[in-house]
Amino acid sequence: MKTNLLAILSIIGLLSIISACSSSKGHQGKGNIFESEWGLVSVKAVTPTDSLLIANNDNTATLEVLSDGTVKGSTSCNIFEGQVALNGYNLKFGNIVSTQLSCYDSTVEAAFYSMLDSTDNYTVDHGHLLLKKGNKVLAQFTPLNMR
């Protein structure tokens, strides 16, 4: 009896270890855009060079896509809201309205709004939200708070 119990406990322990290892690799591929409020990590600049702008960590730009078809967030200076049309992993932002505060450096804000205008699909890769146009990544976000 002790041998059977020990064998069962060993198998359960082994399965737990295997399960923990496979889940720690992260999720690569498509995922749920509604899981979090997302904080901007980087965004492509609005320049011919397509340089990458790194977000200011002091006041993070945010994005939140809601299941009712709305989007809201902050560019780190101004707040915005609008609509989002989702069809699978294809999406289109539209009717974006925002406050019009005068910002010290509007480089990231201009790139952020350009990204919203250009995005046509998304991927969630290892917990990061990637907004893309075709296969080109326009912006990367990290979850700020999971729901």
Report residues per predicted region:
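Lipid interaction determinants
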Residues: 3-6, 21-147
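Bacterial N-terminal signal peptides
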Residues: 8-17
